[in-house]
């Protein structure tokens, strides 16, 4: 009985959190066809969502980006997608880890984050990790945590905001959008935002001191969409620039330009 009530309440919360908010402003929108021309497999696509859930994530992370997905190329025997469909894999609040068409994010503000230096084999490993994750459940224990902070001025100190997104079940079969992507990159020893320890060494009395950096992997549950944006190891790809932007070809409103 208790489990039934809990499931019912969670369902109500999910429907509430996935409701769309008003006044969504598209300012960094690229057509799916244009995105596909610049995307490479294992690129991370950050999205500014238009749901209440998105507002909570953006508040807690103090970021524009509320969702992350990973580009896996054209579908081939990938879930229910027709073969040849440009596809991304994401963790969805209602459906868990799923493959969806790239066109799902048409009209949304997006950003492409590209892992620098990954070779083709490593990119394929990252993608395969995500493919193997299909069907995993979304960690709905985070739903209650996020719902609490949808009041206008949530009383959450800055130092606690990240931990609010790591209060989930701890069940490895349950994920949120950015955690599984973080694990995919960690599986090929690729850094996102590692903790850096600096060790000072001196090999002899007359030798100069040297500083060596040791990277420590952060737990995947602590990663948020924002981390791929601020990571020094991911390149920001702008489709407009990649496709040969020339400001001289723009048509301006003459009155606005002169004023």
Segments predicted by a language model, with ranges:
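Cysteine-nucleophile amide-bond enzymes
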Residues: 1-259
């Amino acid at each position: 009985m208790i489990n039934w009530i809990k499931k019912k309440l969670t369902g109500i919360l999910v429907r509430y959190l996935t409701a769309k908010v008003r006044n969504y402003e598209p300012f960094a929108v690229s057509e799916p066809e244009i995105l596909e021309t610049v995307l490479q497999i294992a690129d991370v696509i950050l999205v500014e969502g238009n749901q209440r859930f998105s507002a909570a994530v953006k508040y807690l992370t103090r970021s524009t980006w509320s969702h992350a997905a990973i580009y896996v190329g054209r579908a081939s025997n990938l879930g229910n997608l027709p073969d040849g469909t440009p596809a991304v894999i994401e963790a969805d609040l209602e459906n868990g880890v799923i493959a969806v068409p790239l066109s799902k994010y048409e009209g949304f503000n997006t950003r492409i984050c590209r892992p620098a230096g990954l070779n083709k084999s490593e990119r394929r490993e990252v993608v395969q990790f995500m493919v193997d994750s299909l069907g995993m459940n979304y960690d709905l224990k985070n739903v209650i945590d996020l719902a609490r902070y949808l009041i206008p001025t949530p009383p959450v100190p800055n130092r606690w905001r990240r931990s609010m997104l790591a209060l989930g079940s701890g069940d490895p079969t349950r994920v949120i959008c950015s955690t599984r992507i973080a694990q995919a990159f960690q599986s090929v020893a690729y850094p996102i935002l590692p903790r850096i320890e600096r060790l000072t060494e001196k090999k002899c009395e007359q030798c100069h001191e040297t500083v060596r950096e040791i990277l420590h992997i952060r737990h995947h549950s602590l990663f948020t969409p924002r981390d791929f944006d601020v990571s020094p190891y991911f390149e920001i790809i702008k489709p407009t620039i990649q496709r040969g932007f020339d400001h001289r070809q723009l048509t301006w409103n003459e009155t606005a330009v002169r004023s």
